[in-house]
Amino acid sequence: MANSNNQLLKEIRYDWNREEILQILNMPLIDLMWEAQIVHRKFNKYDIQLASLFSVKTGGCEENCSYCSQSIYSASEIKSHPQFQVEEVLARAKVAKNEGADRFCMGWAWREIRDGKSFNAMLEMVSGVRDLGMEACVTAGMLTEEQASRLADAGLTAYNHNLDTSPEHYKNIITTRTYQDRLDTIKRVRNAGINVCCGGIIGLGETNGDRASLLEVLSNMNPHPESVPINSLVAIEGTGLEDTQEIDSIEMIRMIATARILMPESKIRLSAGREKLTKEAQILCFQCGANSIFYGDELLTTSNPSFQSDRKLLKEVGVSFNKDFETCEKTLSSL
């Protein structure tokens, strides 16, 4: 590896190039995990953020993302529903908090946020979640500067807008929104003073070079995204990628470890596809840099490990909950 341990720990960089990243990504696995854990221990406390994700409005999205069952171009049989009422969403947030989550993420299957009644309700939901003492995150497509400002005023903690894949592979996945559209949205979020949640998906038919290119874009953002979700494709029947072969868990571990080295202080979130990972694979992801998970039975339209199974897993690796499951603390000194 071109960088020694001292170089890795010396400073946070925003000038990684694709060749450097590819070299890290392709390191012998044991060496890669070792390097990632050194960085992780240097820059982060040993805790795992528990985030709960709820689909506020499902289905009918105008985008043609080939992995998504919520697209109007998808033949998937999903249960679409209009936007939930504010009270219903806040009730879900209370349940998530009582189960141990400290961030409540709300998703809308929209191409973009549009002003009006639905947006006003979104603002109420954000304020209500913050009043519960939780972080609030929204994912709802593109937005304007004014909308970002209003979300910031409502107390929004973070806005999620993933890049999905590399600039080079992107056109093979979606054509109704450009890569630059995504980058512009992220810039508006950042300019409004809202934390950025931005990551991608592996298993979309991309190469290792594409993965390095995606990480190059993310790691050259200054500052780095506060949260970086790393998803693996959940192939859903009726979508354009329904026949895509499932990736090996080692590929997820490599992606998590490399992201940690490149973005030492970001929350690296082990996201969609986690249900397919064994307990041991998840623990390796935690060991080499993942310090956030989605916590709850469902992620928008895909399944997720249950509260009960996650509690058991986190307890086994050293996470203890208080009696009301309202807070959690992770002690992984043994890893």
Curated annotation (Swiss-Prot):
Cofactor info, note text: Binds 1 [4Fe-4S] cluster. The cluster is coordinated with 3 cysteines and an exchangeable S-adenosyl-L-methionine. Binds 1 [2Fe-2S] cluster. The cluster is coordinated with 3 cysteines and 1 arginine.
Residues that hold [4Fe-4S] cluster according to the record: 61, 65, 68
EC number in record: 2.8.1.6
Gene Ontology biological-process annotations: biotin biosynthetic process
NCBIfam families: bioB
Keywords of the record: 2Fe-2S, 4Fe-4S, Biotin biosynthesis, Iron, Iron-sulfur, Metal-binding, S-adenosyl-L-methionine, Transferase
UniProt similarity note: Belongs to the radical SAM superfamily. Biotin synthase family.
Catalytic activity, as annotated: (4R,5S)-dethiobiotin + (sulfur carrier)-SH + 2 reduced [2Fe-2S]-[ferredoxin] + 2 S-adenosyl-L-methionine = (sulfur carrier)-H + biotin + 2 5'-deoxyadenosine + 2 L-methionine + 2 oxidized [2Fe-2S]-[ferredoxin]
Protein origin, superkingdom: Bacteria
Protein name: Biotin synthase
Subunit structure: Homodimer.
Function in brief: Catalyzes the conversion of dethiobiotin (DTB) to biotin by the insertion of a sulfur atom into dethiobiotin via a radical-based mechanism.
Source organism: Prochlorococcus marinus (strain MIT 9301)
Segments forming domain Radical SAM core: 46-274
Pathway(s): Cofactor biosynthesis; biotin biosynthesis; biotin from 7,8-diaminononanoate: step 2/2
Cofactor needs: [4Fe-4S] cluster; [2Fe-2S] cluster
Any GO molecular function: biotin synthase activity
Record-listed [2Fe-2S] cluster binding positions: 105, 137, 197, 269
Organism classification: Bacteria, Bacillati, Cyanobacteriota, Cyanophyceae, Synechococcales
EC class of the enzyme, as a word: transferase
Alphabetical list of InterPro entries matching this protein: Aldolase_TIM, BATS_dom, Biotin_synth/BioAB, Biotin_synthase, Elp3/MiaA/NifB-like_rSAM, rSAM
Pfam families, alphabetized: BATS (PF06968), Radical_SAM (PF04055)
